[in-house]
């Protein structure tokens, strides 16, 4: 079928499928604007789209596998994906791109994140599905992300984070990933924070605001032409970004506060347990009934803690609390601050509302709430959203060291339709390790559930392989290499496999693979090379970064042990 026939067919499908979703006019002279062409389309006015640009499409499956290997991977929600892809189909028909590749996939993130890729895929987080209140809002998100694809932003702008991110965390996070599964040196939240820091960052594009505004204008144009409400759609979408960011900052601050309090209380309790058992002095109204020796011991312990924070670690009765744990949280929060996937929501909404003012004048269609509610309340979707909604409570319980309660809640989350979900299996395994024998299931058994899922997580496969390596290196190597093939040799998985070779004694294999990576996957060059470094090489690299490390440690120590 030639291009003209395909366009005619698209128009016919548009009328048949969509009714209210009208074809969007293209300004006749836009291709002649200096610096603008079919490969570099630009939105100039609301209501009009530039001509459909030509695209060079990367491999769709490679893109999908790379996102499966990223962070917690994807969530198996076939009914929800069917609904979302129906909305994407509307967008494609309305823009004359019905034959373009790509689909909507759901990421295992409870934050508000959405992204698209040069291959044509759109990735939307569970957090958005939990938070959005109407189909208008979901359509706004999808049309915005499709705008990045249509406007060829991936080809025109250098927006990849992979190189910068791998440089930022090189020599640190890959080592953390390869810690033993049941390493009691990890606090529950530390382990979770580092996996989240490693995931999502490398593949999330670093859009500048003017690029985001182009995608906003594109999405609003498509959304309004398809009869969706601006108030319930784009306005709600952009305003929710800012309100979520405020709430997330407050919640993270509360989590850190609870974690700090629990750590300090543990130190105080251990110090009191070691204090000499001597009679207390006479009680006075202004003093607590605590032995003076114990008070002195507590003060002494806190003083030593401050010194030990920069030197190494503090031994407690259960496991080990190290300075590295404090840095884990700083790394996660620091990378999140560097990558803002949706800057300036309120300011963008102000600008966008002015651009579309003439298009929405006198038009106030009601929000399409029922279709969205029907989709969310489909049985599997409802259970999945409810189970992932338990994650913040699990994190808070772990921050408070209430591990038995955290385990009970994690077991509930990783059940039913979500028994094999990667993120929830990880939370369950983590809670099992922290609760110390309160479960018949081991952490690795919890992680291994994910092998039965249609959506495996590379991160859990790495954890399983590292655990295997402690007893059978050859079996572990065979397992992780099989998983590497299963994930289509995804670029995101290369540093982990290289680090596995290094840690299992095959330094030459690690070096050889790192060199191949540096040539064939330039975005991951630094991460691959760092993952191949031996402890001696890492120590040398660390020595060169001592000044930076001292700044980070000093900042963390001020927060963790304020008197």
Language model regions located:
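A Zn2+-metalloprotease active-site environment signal
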Residues: 22-563
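C-terminal motif of bacterial Sec signal peptides marking the signal peptidase cleavage site
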Residues: 17-20
């Amino acid at each position: 079928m030639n291009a003209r026939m395909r366009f005619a067919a698209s128009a016919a499908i548009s009328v048949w499928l969509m009714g209210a979703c009208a074809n969007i006019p293209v300004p006749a002279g836009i291709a002649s604007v200096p610096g603008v062409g079919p490969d570099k389309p630009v939105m100039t006015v609301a209501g009009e789209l530039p001509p459909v640009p030509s695209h060079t499409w990367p491999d769709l499956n490679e893109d999908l596998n790379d996102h499966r290997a990223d962070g917690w991977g994807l969530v198996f929600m076939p009914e929800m994906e069917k609904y979302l892809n129906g909305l994407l189909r509307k967008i494609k028909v309305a823009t004359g791109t019905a034959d373009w590749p790509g689909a909507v996939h759901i990421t295992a993130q409870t934050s508000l994140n959405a992204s698209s890729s040069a291959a044509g895929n759109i990735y939307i987080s569970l957090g958005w599905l939990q938070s959005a209140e109407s189909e208008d809002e979901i359509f706004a998100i999808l049309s915005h992300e499709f705008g990045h694809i249509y406007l060829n932003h991936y080809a025109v702008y250098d927006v990849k984070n992979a190189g910068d991110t791998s440089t930022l965390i090189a020599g640190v996070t890959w080592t953390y990933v390869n810690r033993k599964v049941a390493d009691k040196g990890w606090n529950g939240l530390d382990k979770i924070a580092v996996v989240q820091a490693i995931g999502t960052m490398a593949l999330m594009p670093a859009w500048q605001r003017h690029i985001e505004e182009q995608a906003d204008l594109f999405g609003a144009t498509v959304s309004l032409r398809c009869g969706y409400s601006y108030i319930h759609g784009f306005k709600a979408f952009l305003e929710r970004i800012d309100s979520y960011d405020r709430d997330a900052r407050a919640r993270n601050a509360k989590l850190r506060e609870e974690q700090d309090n629990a750590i300090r209380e543990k130190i105080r309790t251990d110090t009191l347990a070691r204090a000499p058992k001597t009679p207390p002095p006479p009680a006075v109204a202004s003093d607590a009934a605590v032995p003076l020796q114990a008070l002195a011991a507590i003060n002494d312990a806190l003083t030593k803690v401050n010194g030990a924070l920069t030197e190494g670690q503090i031994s407690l009765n259960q496991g080990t609390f190290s300075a590295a744990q404090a840095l884990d949280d700083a790394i996660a929060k620091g990378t999140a601050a560097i990558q803002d996937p949706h800057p300036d929501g309120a300011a963008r909404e102000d600008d966008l509302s002015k651009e579309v003012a003439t298009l929405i004048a006198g038009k106030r269609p009601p929000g399409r709430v029922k279709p969205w509610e029907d989709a969310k309340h489909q049985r599997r979707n409802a259970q999945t959203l409810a189970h992932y909604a338990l994650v913040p409570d699990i994190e808070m319980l772990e921050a408070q060291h209430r591990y038995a309660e955290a385990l009970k809640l994690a077991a509930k989350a990783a059940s039913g339709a979500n028994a094999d979900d990667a993120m929830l299996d990880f939370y369950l395994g983590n809670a099992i390790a922290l609760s110390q024998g309160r479960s018949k299931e081991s952490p690795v058994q919890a992680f291994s559930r994910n092998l039965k899922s249609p959506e495996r997580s590379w991160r859990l496969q790495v954890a399983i392989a590292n655990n295997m390596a402690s007893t059978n290196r050859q079996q572990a190597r065979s397992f992780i290499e099989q998983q590497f093939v299963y994930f289509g040799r995804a670029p995101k998985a290369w540093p982990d496999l290289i680090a596995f070779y290094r840690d299992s004694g095959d330094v030459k294999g690690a070096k050889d693979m790192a060199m191949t990576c540096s040539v064939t996957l330039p975005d991951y060059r630094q991460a691959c090379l760092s993952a191949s470094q031996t402890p001696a090489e890492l120590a040398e690299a660390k020595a060169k970064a001592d000044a930076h490390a001292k700044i980070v440690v000093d900042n963390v120590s001020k927060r963790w042990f304020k008197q």
